[in-house]
Amino acid sequence: MGADGTMSPVLTKRRPDQEINKLDIKPNHEVDIARRAPHSKPPFTLSDLRSAIPPHCFHRSLLMSSSYLIRDFALAFLFYHSAVTYIPLLPKPLACMAWPVYWFLQGSNMLGIWVIAHECGHQAFSNYGWVNDAVGFFLHTSLLVPYFPFKYSHRRHHSNTNSVEHDEVFVPRHKDGVQWYYRFFNNTPGRVLTLTLTLLVGWPSYLAFNASGRPYDGFASHYNPNAQIFNLRERFWVHVSNIGILAIYYILYRLATTKGLPWLLSIYGVPVLILNAFVVLITFLQHSHPALPHYNSDEWDWLRGALATVDRDYGFLNEVFHDITDTHVIHHLFPTMPHYNAKEATVSIRPILKDYYKFDRTPIWRALWREAKECLYVEADGTGSKGVLWFKSKF
């Protein structure tokens, strides 16, 4: 039996990477972004979808997963070595142009490492739980992410996706829950300011203060072992994660005292800022779309909630980000599936999903602006069930 509770099938042969990379998971027709996704109970089950996927797609290979991690580490070292060796040799005007290139490349590569750590939390890295947690703890901690607390809250996000009462993050407000001052930011300058702050500090604010998260009584923080986010069994591991984060901060402090704060910010700080911005950008756009429903407890069920996500195209960054961007729907349906099989699985189930599958081709920055403008709160539209809620923007 597999870790996700399914019987381990006889494995079929995995396609070569060259074939997988050529798979086109985009629908072969333009999707009307204004056309709402179906919200009725789908005519298929999770078992139907699983049966349509080649069995090898569920196989988690420690060797294969490690090869992607080694690739990311090699790129991280290459970018670091190039930055510290060659950028100081450049004339100042060229150096000023080279540093942003390094920051973008290293920050993007860090997001790939972040995704592998996220897979460890889903037990998708290998068949060995202790390996998954050891690797995930090391990777996420090095990126200033408390591995175990995020693993626990993220698991509950997957268990309650698009439930307005029980989802964990990017929980939309009802119209009467929108703070009065939001109306003053519902314009171009306000959105620019809001988006900038959200991208820069949104991820650490969520971890530290549960910003945009599910409301809890008391101080809800991923660093607080007594927060209602966690049960008694999980609190010990919150302490372990906190110790790991403190150790990283101490290492950073020592680097700042020996190499200097400007060096540390240039080599590590700004790339982490880029990483954090990508985390917010990607997760926001995966779960915010004018055509996607949310549900209250009268209508919500797990399958419909998991289907109400959207895949998007980030161009060459899809591969850098291990396809968490363009295969997010399949990830919510089968979170223990490793990323390198997600494209093939998506292609396999798309004929069954039909209109339940959403792929938005809109360029990312245009989509970010549209969603920030149109996805301000949710409410029933009066034409169907009061338990099905849609994004609105008019006050």
Swiss-Prot record:
Enzyme Commission number(s) from the entry: 1.14.19.-, 1.14.19.16
Regions annotated as coiled coil: none
Membrane-spanning segments: 73-93, 97-117, 130-150, 192-212, 236-256, 264-284
Keyword vocabulary terms for this entry: Fatty acid biosynthesis, Fatty acid metabolism, Lipid biosynthesis, Lipid metabolism, Membrane, Oxidoreductase, Transmembrane, Transmembrane helix
Top-level taxon in the UniProt lineage: Eukaryota
GO CC terms of this entry: membrane
Pfam family for this entry, one: DUF3474
Chief site of localization: membrane
Motif Histidine box-3 per record, residues: 328-332
GO MF entries: oxidoreductase activity, acting on paired donors, with oxidation of a pair of donors resulting in the reduction of molecular oxygen to two molecules of water
Motif mapping: Histidine box-1: 118-122
Topology versus the membrane: Multi-pass membrane protein
GO biological process: unsaturated fatty acid biosynthetic process
Pathway annotation: Lipid metabolism; polyunsaturated fatty acid biosynthesis
Catalytic activity: a (9Z,12Z)-octadecadienoyl-containing glycerolipid + 2 Fe(II)-[cytochrome b5] + O2 + 2 H(+) = a (9Z,11E,13Z)-octadeca-9,11,13-trienoyl-containing glycerolipid + 2 Fe(III)-[cytochrome b5] + 2 H2O
Motif (Histidine box-2): 154-158
UniProt entry tagged with the keyword Transmembrane helix: yes
Subcellular location: Membrane
Similarity-based family: Belongs to the fatty acid desaturase type 1 family.
Domain text: The histidine box domains may contain the active site and/or be involved in metal ion binding.
Name of the protein this chain belongs to: Bifunctional fatty acid conjugase/Delta(12)-oleate desaturase
Organism from which the protein derives: Punica granatum (Pomegranate)
Organism lineage string: Eukaryota, Viridiplantae, Streptophyta, Embryophyta, Tracheophyta
